[in-house]
Protein backbone atom coordinates (compact mmCIF):
# COMPACT_ATOMS: atom_id res chain seq x y z
CA UNK A 1 0.00 0.00 0.00
CA UNK A 2 1.40 3.39 -1.04
CA UNK A 3 0.53 5.80 1.78
CA UNK A 4 2.22 8.84 0.21
CA UNK A 5 0.94 8.56 -3.36
CA UNK A 6 4.40 8.54 -4.94
CA UNK A 7 5.08 12.10 -3.77
CA UNK A 8 8.73 12.95 -3.06
CA UNK A 9 9.84 15.97 -1.04
CA UNK A 10 10.23 18.34 -3.99
CA UNK A 11 6.65 17.74 -5.05
CA UNK A 12 5.49 18.08 -1.44
CA UNK A 13 6.90 21.59 -1.09
CA UNK A 14 5.65 22.79 -4.46
CA UNK A 15 2.17 21.57 -3.56
CA UNK A 16 2.28 23.09 -0.05
CA UNK A 17 3.24 26.48 -1.50
CA UNK A 18 0.33 26.30 -3.95
CA UNK A 19 -2.24 25.19 -1.38
CA UNK A 20 -1.27 27.27 1.68
CA UNK A 21 0.48 30.24 0.05
CA UNK A 22 0.73 33.09 2.55
CA UNK A 23 -0.23 31.02 5.60
CA UNK A 24 2.57 30.92 8.21
CA UNK A 25 4.64 27.77 7.82
CA UNK A 26 7.71 28.37 9.98
CA UNK A 27 8.61 30.53 12.96
CA UNK A 28 12.17 30.38 14.31
CA UNK A 29 13.17 32.00 17.60
CA UNK A 30 16.88 32.34 18.37
CA UNK A 31 18.39 32.23 21.85
CA UNK A 32 18.78 36.00 21.60
CA UNK A 33 15.07 36.44 20.98
CA UNK A 34 15.28 37.16 17.23
CA UNK A 35 12.18 35.81 15.47
CA UNK A 36 11.98 34.91 11.77
CA UNK A 37 8.67 34.03 10.11
CA UNK A 38 8.03 32.45 6.72
CA UNK A 39 4.82 31.69 4.87
CA UNK A 40 4.54 28.45 2.92
CA UNK A 41 5.21 30.39 -0.28
CA UNK A 42 8.22 32.22 1.19
CA UNK A 43 9.65 29.07 2.73
CA UNK A 44 9.40 27.20 -0.58
CA UNK A 45 11.19 30.09 -2.28
CA UNK A 46 13.98 30.02 0.32
CA UNK A 47 14.27 26.26 -0.19
CA UNK A 48 14.49 26.77 -3.97
CA UNK A 49 17.21 29.40 -3.57
CA UNK A 50 19.12 27.00 -1.35
CA UNK A 51 18.76 24.22 -3.93
CA UNK A 52 20.17 26.56 -6.58
CA UNK A 53 23.02 27.54 -4.25
CA UNK A 54 24.04 23.90 -3.82
CA UNK A 55 23.85 23.35 -7.57
CA UNK A 56 26.19 26.29 -8.23
CA UNK A 57 28.65 24.74 -5.76
CA UNK A 58 28.69 21.52 -7.74
CA UNK A 59 26.32 19.45 -5.63
CA UNK A 60 24.43 16.82 -7.61
CA UNK A 61 22.02 13.99 -6.94
CA UNK A 62 23.51 11.48 -4.49
CA UNK A 63 26.12 13.86 -3.05
CA UNK A 64 26.30 14.15 0.73
CA UNK A 65 26.24 17.52 2.47
CA UNK A 66 26.84 17.81 6.21
CA UNK A 67 25.00 20.31 8.43
CA UNK A 68 26.49 21.27 11.80
CA UNK A 69 23.96 23.82 13.02
CA UNK A 70 21.85 24.72 16.01
CA UNK A 71 18.11 25.17 15.43
CA UNK A 72 17.79 27.91 12.80
CA UNK A 73 15.97 28.67 9.53
CA UNK A 74 19.04 27.66 7.52
CA UNK A 75 18.71 24.08 8.74
CA UNK A 76 15.21 23.87 7.24
CA UNK A 77 16.35 25.55 4.00
CA UNK A 78 19.22 23.09 3.60
CA UNK A 79 17.27 19.97 4.60
CA UNK A 80 14.66 20.40 1.89
CA UNK A 81 16.92 22.27 -0.52
CA UNK A 82 19.16 19.23 -0.71
CA UNK A 83 16.16 16.92 -1.09
CA UNK A 84 14.89 18.92 -4.08
CA UNK A 85 18.14 18.31 -5.94
CA UNK A 86 18.33 14.65 -4.91
CA UNK A 87 21.33 15.28 -2.65
CA UNK A 88 21.62 13.78 0.84
CA UNK A 89 21.65 15.65 4.14
CA UNK A 90 24.01 14.48 6.89
CA UNK A 91 23.00 16.32 10.08
CA UNK A 92 25.70 16.41 12.75
CA UNK A 93 24.84 16.73 16.42
CA UNK A 94 25.73 20.33 17.25
CA UNK A 95 27.14 19.26 20.63
CA UNK A 96 29.75 16.91 19.17
CA UNK A 97 33.42 17.76 19.48
CA UNK A 98 36.25 17.44 16.94
CA UNK A 99 36.89 13.69 17.01
CA UNK A 100 33.24 12.69 16.72
CA UNK A 101 32.46 15.29 14.06
CA UNK A 102 35.48 14.24 12.01
CA UNK A 103 34.44 10.60 12.27
CA UNK A 104 30.98 11.37 10.86
CA UNK A 105 32.44 13.50 8.06
CA UNK A 106 34.78 10.68 7.07
CA UNK A 107 32.20 7.91 7.27
CA UNK A 108 29.40 9.82 5.54
CA UNK A 109 31.61 10.88 2.59
CA UNK A 110 30.29 14.44 2.87
CA UNK A 111 31.86 16.79 0.33
CA UNK A 112 30.38 20.07 1.58
CA UNK A 113 29.60 21.44 5.05
CA UNK A 114 27.16 24.12 6.17
CA UNK A 115 27.92 25.41 9.66
CA UNK A 116 28.23 28.59 11.72
CA UNK A 117 31.18 30.64 12.93
CA UNK A 118 31.16 29.08 16.40
CA UNK A 119 31.97 25.65 14.93
CA UNK A 120 34.29 26.80 12.14
CA UNK A 121 37.60 26.66 14.11
CA UNK A 122 36.94 22.99 14.83
CA UNK A 123 36.44 22.25 11.14
CA UNK A 124 39.57 24.18 10.24
CA UNK A 125 41.45 21.76 12.47
CA UNK A 126 39.64 18.77 10.98
CA UNK A 127 40.58 19.83 7.46
CA UNK A 128 44.22 20.17 8.49
CA UNK A 129 44.53 16.95 10.48
CA UNK A 130 41.93 14.45 9.23
CA UNK A 131 41.33 12.72 5.91
CA UNK A 132 37.90 13.83 4.65
CA UNK A 133 36.29 14.43 1.26
CA UNK A 134 35.27 17.94 2.30
CA UNK A 135 35.74 20.41 -0.58
CA UNK A 136 33.96 23.50 0.67
CA UNK A 137 32.44 25.12 3.77
CA UNK A 138 29.49 27.52 3.84
CA UNK A 139 29.07 29.68 6.94
CA UNK A 140 25.66 31.01 7.92
CA UNK A 141 27.18 34.09 9.60
CA UNK A 142 27.63 37.47 7.91
CA UNK A 143 31.32 37.91 8.79
CA UNK A 144 33.62 35.52 6.94
CA UNK A 145 37.23 34.48 7.56
CA UNK A 146 39.66 35.19 4.72
CA UNK A 147 40.17 31.50 4.01
CA UNK A 148 40.04 29.60 0.74
CA UNK A 149 37.15 27.21 0.32
CA UNK A 150 34.82 29.19 2.60
CA UNK A 151 31.80 31.21 1.50
CA UNK A 152 28.74 32.92 2.92
CA UNK A 153 25.64 30.75 2.80
CA UNK A 154 23.31 33.74 3.10
CA UNK A 155 25.02 35.85 0.44
CA UNK A 156 25.13 32.99 -2.05
CA UNK A 157 21.53 32.03 -1.33
CA UNK A 158 20.20 35.55 -1.76
CA UNK A 159 21.84 35.77 -5.19
CA UNK A 160 19.81 32.80 -6.43
CA UNK A 161 16.42 32.88 -8.18
CA UNK A 162 13.35 31.74 -6.25
CA UNK A 163 12.49 29.10 -8.85
CA UNK A 164 14.46 25.91 -9.42
CA UNK A 165 17.22 26.00 -12.03
CA UNK A 166 17.80 22.25 -11.94
CA UNK A 167 15.33 19.48 -11.14
CA UNK A 168 16.67 15.96 -11.70
CA UNK A 169 14.30 12.99 -11.72
CA UNK A 170 13.48 11.88 -8.18
CA UNK A 171 11.97 8.76 -6.65
CA UNK A 172 10.44 8.25 -3.23
CA UNK A 173 13.01 5.47 -2.81
CA UNK A 174 15.90 7.96 -3.10
CA UNK A 175 17.94 8.58 0.03
CA UNK A 176 17.14 11.96 1.59
CA UNK A 177 19.26 11.76 4.71
CA UNK A 178 21.86 9.80 6.64
CA UNK A 179 21.25 10.42 10.33
CA UNK A 180 23.93 9.12 12.65
CA UNK A 181 22.60 7.65 15.89
CA UNK A 182 23.54 9.23 19.19
CA UNK A 183 26.02 6.47 20.03
CA UNK A 184 25.66 6.46 23.83
CA UNK A 185 27.36 3.05 24.03
CA UNK A 186 29.41 2.77 20.81
CA UNK A 187 30.31 4.51 17.55
CA UNK A 188 27.24 5.98 15.85
CA UNK A 189 25.75 4.22 12.84
CA UNK A 190 24.40 6.05 9.80
CA UNK A 191 20.66 5.48 9.53
CA UNK A 192 19.60 5.76 5.88
CA UNK A 193 16.28 7.62 5.50
CA UNK A 194 14.43 7.93 2.19
CA UNK A 195 12.02 10.47 0.74
CA UNK A 196 9.28 7.92 1.41
CA UNK A 197 10.34 7.63 5.06
CA UNK A 198 10.02 11.38 5.58
CA UNK A 199 6.73 11.71 3.72
CA UNK A 200 5.27 8.77 5.63
CA UNK A 201 6.55 10.24 8.91
CA UNK A 202 4.63 13.43 8.20
CA UNK A 203 1.34 11.66 7.62
CA UNK A 204 1.83 9.23 10.51
CA UNK A 205 2.85 11.81 13.12
CA UNK A 206 0.08 14.17 12.03
CA UNK A 207 -2.38 11.29 12.52
CA UNK A 208 -0.90 10.45 15.92
CA UNK A 209 -1.71 13.85 17.41
CA UNK A 210 -4.65 14.63 15.09
CA UNK A 211 -2.99 17.69 13.54
CA UNK A 212 -5.02 20.19 11.51
CA UNK A 213 -3.96 23.18 9.45
CA UNK A 214 -4.95 25.55 12.28
CA UNK A 215 -2.55 23.88 14.74
CA UNK A 216 0.73 25.33 15.98
CA UNK A 217 3.42 22.73 16.74
CA UNK A 218 6.25 24.10 18.91
CA UNK A 219 9.47 22.21 19.59
CA UNK A 220 12.81 22.83 21.25
CA UNK A 221 14.15 19.44 20.20
CA UNK A 222 17.34 19.78 18.11
CA UNK A 223 16.75 19.88 14.36
CA UNK A 224 19.48 17.32 13.77
CA UNK A 225 17.43 14.77 15.74
CA UNK A 226 14.77 12.39 14.41
CA UNK A 227 12.12 13.66 16.86
CA UNK A 228 12.29 17.23 15.61
CA UNK A 229 12.36 16.18 11.98
CA UNK A 230 9.82 13.36 11.80
CA UNK A 231 7.54 13.82 14.81
CA UNK A 232 7.32 17.61 14.70
CA UNK A 233 8.45 19.30 11.47
CA UNK A 234 7.21 16.76 8.92
CA UNK A 235 3.93 16.40 10.82
CA UNK A 236 3.32 20.15 10.95
CA UNK A 237 4.18 20.75 7.30
CA UNK A 238 2.20 17.73 6.07
CA UNK A 239 -0.88 19.06 7.87
CA UNK A 240 -0.40 22.63 6.64
CA UNK A 241 0.08 23.73 10.26
CA UNK A 242 2.56 26.24 11.68
CA UNK A 243 5.89 24.87 12.90
CA UNK A 244 7.67 26.83 15.66
CA UNK A 245 11.37 25.97 16.04
CA UNK A 246 13.06 27.37 19.16
CA UNK A 247 16.86 27.44 19.06
CA UNK A 248 17.53 26.03 22.53
CA UNK A 249 15.54 24.84 25.50
CA UNK A 250 15.34 27.10 28.54
CA UNK A 251 13.27 25.99 31.53
CA UNK A 252 12.64 29.64 32.39
CA UNK A 253 11.51 30.59 28.88
CA UNK A 254 9.78 27.48 27.54
CA UNK A 255 6.30 27.86 29.00
CA UNK A 256 6.25 31.51 28.01
CA UNK A 257 7.09 30.47 24.44
CA UNK A 258 4.25 27.94 24.46
CA UNK A 259 1.89 30.74 25.50
CA UNK A 260 3.40 33.41 23.22
CA UNK A 261 3.00 31.36 20.05
CA UNK A 262 -0.33 29.86 21.13
CA UNK A 263 1.05 26.37 20.60
CA UNK A 264 -1.50 23.56 20.44
CA UNK A 265 1.03 20.71 20.34
CA UNK A 266 4.53 20.39 21.77
CA UNK A 267 6.91 17.62 22.79
CA UNK A 268 8.82 16.96 26.01
CA UNK A 269 11.41 14.61 27.42
CA UNK A 270 11.71 13.79 31.15
CA UNK A 271 14.52 16.30 31.70
CA UNK A 272 12.27 19.09 30.44
CA UNK A 273 9.38 18.06 32.67
CA UNK A 274 11.61 17.90 35.74
CA UNK A 275 13.22 21.28 35.11
CA UNK A 276 9.84 22.88 34.35
CA UNK A 277 8.52 21.55 37.65
CA UNK A 278 11.53 23.13 39.39
CA UNK A 279 10.42 26.60 38.21
CA UNK A 280 8.35 28.74 40.61
CA UNK A 281 4.61 28.08 40.12
CA UNK A 282 2.67 30.83 38.38
CA UNK A 283 -1.00 31.71 38.22
CA UNK A 284 -0.59 31.60 34.43
CA UNK A 285 0.68 28.01 34.26
CA UNK A 286 -2.65 26.80 32.90
CA UNK A 287 -3.14 29.71 30.50
CA UNK A 288 -2.29 27.99 27.22
CA UNK A 289 -3.85 26.30 24.17
CA UNK A 290 -1.97 23.00 24.34
CA UNK A 291 -4.04 20.04 23.26
CA UNK A 292 -1.28 17.42 23.33
CA UNK A 293 2.19 17.11 24.85
CA UNK A 294 4.07 14.41 22.97
CA UNK A 295 6.14 12.57 25.56
CA UNK A 296 9.12 10.24 25.31
CA UNK A 297 10.33 7.84 27.99
CA UNK A 298 10.62 7.70 31.00
CA UNK A 299 8.84 9.23 34.00
CA UNK A 300 7.42 8.05 37.31
CA UNK A 301 3.65 8.19 37.78
CA UNK A 302 4.06 10.68 40.62
CA UNK A 303 6.05 13.04 38.39
CA UNK A 304 3.55 12.64 35.55
CA UNK A 305 0.56 13.38 37.76
CA UNK A 306 2.20 16.43 39.33
CA UNK A 307 3.13 17.88 35.93
CA UNK A 308 -0.30 17.29 34.39
CA UNK A 309 -2.07 18.75 37.42
CA UNK A 310 0.06 21.88 37.61
CA UNK A 311 0.01 22.77 33.91
CA UNK A 312 -3.37 21.35 32.97
CA UNK A 313 -2.06 19.16 30.16
CA UNK A 314 -2.12 15.52 29.20
CA UNK A 315 0.79 13.47 27.89
CA UNK A 316 0.61 11.57 24.61
CA UNK A 317 3.17 8.80 24.97
CA UNK A 318 5.20 7.87 21.91
CA UNK A 319 7.88 5.17 21.67
CA UNK A 320 10.36 4.88 18.85
CA UNK A 321 13.98 5.25 17.83
CA UNK A 322 15.94 6.67 14.92
CA UNK A 323 15.56 3.41 13.01
CA UNK A 324 11.76 3.41 13.33
CA UNK A 325 11.55 7.01 12.02
CA UNK A 326 8.43 7.74 14.12
CA UNK A 327 6.82 6.66 17.39
CA UNK A 328 5.69 3.26 16.15
CA UNK A 329 4.08 2.41 19.50
CA UNK A 330 2.10 5.11 21.26
CA UNK A 331 -1.18 6.57 22.37
CA UNK A 332 -3.71 6.88 19.56
CA UNK A 333 -6.00 9.81 18.79
CA UNK A 334 -9.35 9.28 20.47
CA UNK A 335 -8.23 6.04 22.12
CA UNK A 336 -7.91 5.31 25.84
CA UNK A 337 -4.55 5.83 27.51
CA UNK A 338 -3.19 3.43 30.06
CA UNK A 339 -0.26 4.78 32.07
CA UNK A 340 2.48 3.54 32.34
CA UNK A 341 1.86 1.79 29.02
CA UNK A 342 3.72 3.23 26.04
CA UNK A 343 0.60 2.59 23.96
CA UNK A 344 -0.27 0.26 21.12
CA UNK A 345 1.25 -0.32 17.69
CA UNK A 346 0.31 2.35 15.16
CA UNK A 347 -1.07 1.83 11.68
CA UNK A 348 1.25 0.11 9.17
CA UNK A 349 3.16 -1.61 11.99
CA UNK A 350 3.14 -4.88 13.89
CA UNK A 351 4.74 -5.28 17.31
CA UNK A 352 5.71 -8.37 19.31
CA UNK A 353 7.62 -9.32 22.43
CA UNK A 354 10.22 -11.99 21.64
CA UNK A 355 12.51 -14.18 23.73
CA UNK A 356 16.26 -14.74 23.34
CA UNK A 357 15.54 -17.36 20.66
CA UNK A 358 13.45 -14.90 18.60
CA UNK A 359 10.17 -16.60 19.53
CA UNK A 360 7.02 -14.57 20.31
CA UNK A 361 6.13 -14.41 24.01
CA UNK A 362 2.62 -14.39 25.50
CA UNK A 363 1.09 -11.39 27.26
CA UNK A 364 2.77 -10.46 30.53
CA UNK A 365 6.19 -11.98 29.81
CA UNK A 366 9.22 -9.72 29.46
CA UNK A 367 11.32 -9.93 26.30
CA UNK A 368 12.64 -7.81 23.45
CA UNK A 369 10.33 -5.33 21.74
CA UNK A 370 10.32 -6.14 18.01
CA UNK A 371 8.65 -4.09 15.28
CA UNK A 372 7.63 -5.06 11.76
CA UNK A 373 7.66 -2.41 9.06
CA UNK A 374 8.74 -1.92 5.46
CA UNK A 375 12.43 -0.98 5.12
CA UNK A 376 12.89 2.34 3.34
CA UNK A 377 9.21 3.18 3.77
CA UNK A 378 7.87 2.83 7.32
CA UNK A 379 11.22 2.02 8.97
CA UNK A 380 14.79 2.90 8.03
CA UNK A 381 16.30 1.42 4.88
CA UNK A 382 19.68 0.28 6.25
CA UNK A 383 22.81 1.40 8.05
CA UNK A 384 25.05 3.31 5.66
CA UNK A 385 27.85 1.06 4.31
CA UNK A 386 27.33 -1.33 7.23
CA UNK A 387 25.45 -4.45 6.06
CA UNK A 388 26.67 -6.47 9.04
CA UNK A 389 25.11 -4.05 11.53
CA UNK A 390 21.95 -3.89 9.42
CA UNK A 391 21.59 -7.68 9.38
CA UNK A 392 22.05 -7.79 13.15
CA UNK A 393 18.90 -5.74 13.83
CA UNK A 394 16.78 -6.01 10.67
CA UNK A 395 15.39 -9.31 9.42
CA UNK A 396 14.69 -9.93 5.74
CA UNK A 397 10.92 -9.84 6.31
CA UNK A 398 11.03 -6.40 7.96
CA UNK A 399 11.17 -7.33 11.66
CA UNK A 400 13.35 -4.83 13.55
CA UNK A 401 15.02 -5.76 16.84
CA UNK A 402 14.97 -2.66 19.03
CA UNK A 403 17.27 -3.86 21.80
CA UNK A 404 14.64 -2.69 24.31
CA UNK A 405 12.91 -4.95 26.80
CA UNK A 406 9.23 -4.79 27.62
CA UNK A 407 5.97 -6.71 27.71
CA UNK A 408 2.41 -6.36 26.46
CA UNK A 409 -0.97 -7.03 28.03
CA UNK A 410 -3.99 -8.90 26.68
CA UNK A 411 -5.35 -5.77 24.95
CA UNK A 412 -2.15 -5.07 23.03
CA UNK A 413 -0.84 -2.27 25.27
CA UNK A 414 2.94 -2.34 25.47
CA UNK A 415 5.08 -1.53 28.50
CA UNK A 416 8.71 -0.45 28.34
CA UNK A 417 11.09 -1.99 30.88
CA UNK A 418 14.57 -0.86 29.83
CA UNK A 419 17.28 -0.94 27.24
CA UNK A 420 18.83 -4.40 27.29
CA UNK A 421 22.21 -2.79 27.83
CA UNK A 422 20.78 -0.95 30.88
CA UNK A 423 19.72 -4.09 32.75
CA UNK A 424 21.93 -4.68 35.79
CA UNK A 425 22.70 -8.28 36.72
CA UNK A 426 22.94 -8.50 40.49
CA UNK A 427 23.36 -11.82 42.25
CA UNK A 428 21.23 -13.71 39.73
CA UNK A 429 18.54 -11.00 39.55
CA UNK A 430 17.93 -8.65 36.62
CA UNK A 431 17.41 -5.07 37.78
CA UNK A 432 15.96 -2.37 35.53
CA UNK A 433 17.76 0.96 35.70
CA UNK A 434 14.58 2.76 34.64
CA UNK A 435 12.56 1.20 37.45
CA UNK A 436 15.05 2.36 40.08
CA UNK A 437 15.39 5.81 38.53
CA UNK A 438 11.62 6.31 38.56
CA UNK A 439 11.48 5.42 42.25
CA UNK A 440 14.45 7.55 43.29
CA UNK A 441 13.16 10.50 41.23
CA UNK A 442 10.19 10.79 43.61
CA UNK A 443 12.49 11.93 46.44
CA UNK A 444 11.61 15.60 47.01
CA UNK A 445 15.25 16.72 47.14
CA UNK A 446 16.32 15.04 43.89
CA UNK A 447 16.04 16.79 40.51
CA UNK A 448 17.83 14.26 38.27
CA UNK A 449 18.95 10.65 38.67
CA UNK A 450 20.69 7.84 36.83
CA UNK A 451 21.81 4.44 38.09
CA UNK A 452 24.50 2.27 36.51
CA UNK A 453 25.99 -1.13 37.14
CA UNK A 454 29.62 -1.39 38.18
CA UNK A 455 31.69 -4.54 38.46
CA UNK A 456 31.33 -6.51 41.68
CA UNK A 457 33.41 -9.64 42.28
CA UNK A 458 30.69 -11.25 44.40
CA UNK A 459 27.33 -10.15 42.96
CA UNK A 460 28.22 -9.68 39.26
CA UNK A 461 27.35 -6.00 39.43
CA UNK A 462 26.78 -3.44 42.15
CA UNK A 463 24.42 -0.51 41.68
CA UNK A 464 25.64 3.08 41.81
CA UNK A 465 23.32 6.08 41.83
CA UNK A 466 24.30 9.49 40.45
CA UNK A 467 21.95 12.26 41.57
CA UNK A 468 21.53 15.98 40.99
CA UNK A 469 19.83 17.80 43.85
CA UNK A 470 17.31 20.60 43.67
CA UNK A 471 18.85 24.01 44.21
CA UNK A 472 19.75 24.66 47.85
CA UNK A 473 19.17 21.07 49.00
CA UNK A 474 21.53 18.72 50.81
CA UNK A 475 21.21 14.95 51.02
CA UNK A 476 23.14 12.60 53.30
CA UNK A 477 23.98 9.03 52.33
CA UNK A 478 22.00 7.82 55.34
CA UNK A 479 18.86 9.64 54.19
CA UNK A 480 19.28 8.44 50.61
CA UNK A 481 19.78 4.76 51.41
CA UNK A 482 16.95 4.80 53.97
CA UNK A 483 14.61 6.15 51.31
CA UNK A 484 15.67 3.41 48.88
CA UNK A 485 15.25 0.66 51.47
CA UNK A 486 11.71 1.87 52.17
CA UNK A 487 10.69 1.95 48.52
CA UNK A 488 12.32 -1.00 46.75
CA UNK A 489 13.34 -4.62 47.23
CA UNK A 490 16.57 -5.11 49.14
CA UNK A 491 18.49 -6.49 46.16
CA UNK A 492 17.62 -3.34 44.17
CA UNK A 493 18.97 -0.85 46.71
CA UNK A 494 22.06 0.94 45.33
CA UNK A 495 25.39 0.28 47.01
CA UNK A 496 26.95 3.63 46.13
CA UNK A 497 25.84 7.25 45.84
CA UNK A 498 27.50 10.15 44.05
CA UNK A 499 26.03 13.66 44.10
CA UNK A 500 26.86 15.74 41.01
CA UNK A 501 26.07 19.19 39.65
CA UNK A 502 24.77 17.70 36.39
CA UNK A 503 24.61 14.50 34.36
CA UNK A 504 26.13 13.96 30.90
CA UNK A 505 23.42 13.92 28.24
CA UNK A 506 23.32 13.69 24.48
CA UNK A 507 21.27 15.93 22.17
CA UNK A 508 18.02 14.09 22.84
CA UNK A 509 18.37 14.26 26.60
CA UNK A 510 19.48 10.67 27.05
CA UNK A 511 22.07 9.99 29.73
CA UNK A 512 25.48 9.06 28.31
CA UNK A 513 26.06 6.18 30.70
CA UNK A 514 29.51 5.32 29.38
CA UNK A 515 30.71 8.64 30.89
CA UNK A 516 29.65 7.55 34.38
CA UNK A 517 31.62 5.15 36.54
Swiss-Prot record:
Q: Which reaction does it catalyse?
A: 4-(trimethylamino)butanoate + ATP + CoA = 4-(trimethylamino)butanoyl-CoA + AMP + diphosphate; crotonobetaine + ATP + CoA = crotonobetainyl-CoA + AMP + diphosphate; (R)-carnitine + ATP + CoA = (R)-carnitinyl-CoA + AMP + diphosphate
One GO MF term attached to the UniProt entry: carnitine-CoA ligase activity
Write down the EC number.
Answer: 6.2.1.48
Q: Which Gene3D superfamilies match?
A: 3.30.300.30, N-terminal domain of ligase-like
Q: In which pathway does it act?
A: Amine and polyamine metabolism; carnitine metabolism
SUPFAM superfamilies, per this entry?
Acetyl-CoA synthetase-like (SSF56801)
> Which CDD domains does this chain map to?
FACL_DitJ_like (cd05934)
Name the Pfam families for this protein. AMP-binding (PF00501), AMP-binding_C (PF13193)
According to the record, the segments passing through the membrane are none
List, in alphabetical order, the GO biological process terms annotated in this UniProt record: carnitine metabolic process; fatty acid metabolic process
Keywords in alphabetical order, please: Ligase
Q: Which PANTHER family match?
A: ACYL-COA SYNTHETASE (PTHR43201), MEDIUM-CHAIN ACYL-COA LIGASE ACSF2, MITOCHONDRIAL (PTHR43201:SF5)
UniProt record similarity statement: Belongs to the ATP-dependent AMP-binding enzyme family.
Task: Tell me, in a sentence or two, what this protein's role is.
Answer: Catalyzes the transfer of CoA to carnitine, generating the initial carnitinyl-CoA needed for the CaiB reaction cycle. Also has activity toward crotonobetaine and gamma-butyrobetaine.
List the protein's name: Crotonobetaine/carnitine--CoA ligase
Amino acid sequence: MDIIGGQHLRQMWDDLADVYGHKTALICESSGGVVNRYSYLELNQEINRTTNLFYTLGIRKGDKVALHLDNCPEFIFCWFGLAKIGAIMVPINARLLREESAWILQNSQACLLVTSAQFYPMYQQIQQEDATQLRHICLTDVALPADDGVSSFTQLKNQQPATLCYAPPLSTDDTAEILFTSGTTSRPKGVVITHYNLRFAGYYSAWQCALRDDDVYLTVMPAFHIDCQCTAAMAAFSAGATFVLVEKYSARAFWGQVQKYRATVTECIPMMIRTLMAQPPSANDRQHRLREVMFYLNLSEQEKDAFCERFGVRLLTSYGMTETIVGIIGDRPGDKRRWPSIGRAGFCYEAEIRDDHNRPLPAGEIGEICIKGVPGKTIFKEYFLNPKATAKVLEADGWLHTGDTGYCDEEGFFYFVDRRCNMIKRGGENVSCVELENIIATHPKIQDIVVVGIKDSIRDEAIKAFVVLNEGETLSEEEFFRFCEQNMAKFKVPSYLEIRKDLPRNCSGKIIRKNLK
